[in-house]
Amino acid sequence: MYSDLSKYFADVKDKSAHDVCEFIGGKVKQNDFKNCCAVRMSYAFNKAGIKIPFTENKTVSGEGKKDWYIYRVKDFKAFLNSKNYKKYTTKQNSLDDFDNKTGVIVFDVDWEDATGHVDLFNGKSVEGSDYTSQSKSITLYEIN
């Protein structure tokens, strides 16, 4: 499953937030989110067959209204918790505790415009943007 997530995440991980919104279309495009990490992850999950469910005030539809996209990190964390993935949390500014584990990594950071960042972890490093040094805590949801 992780390999599928990584494959589809590659479609959007290097795009700007604006370009991600354009690529997905629909209400995602209309909102033109400035922070798109949860939208990027929603895209990967939807394409990998782990569908994001509609949740009022927490998801928006893409082009064609067949897939739903979470746009806040805190709501993506709630989605991950609902899936009962094994999770590991560290308060250290290090990813050593996650060596050889793959899955979704969540950085809890107090930014003015976001509560954190969600990305993929390949067992050694973060696939997209790594905010280890800025995090209060880091959680890995293990997906093999």
Where are these regions (language model features)?
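N-terminal capping segments
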Residues: 1-66
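Weak global preference for isoleucine
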Residues: 24, 50-52, 70, 105, ...
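...with weaker cross-activation on analogous glycine-rich loops/strands in unrelated enzymes
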Residues: 59-131
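Residue-level marker of intrinsically disordered, low-complexity segments enriched
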Residues: 26, 37, 102-104, 116, ...
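Active-site-proximal beta-strand/loop segments in catalytic clefts of secreted hydrolases
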Residues: 44, 107-110, 143
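Glycine-rich, aromatic-bearing surface loops/beta-hairpins
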Residues: 125-144
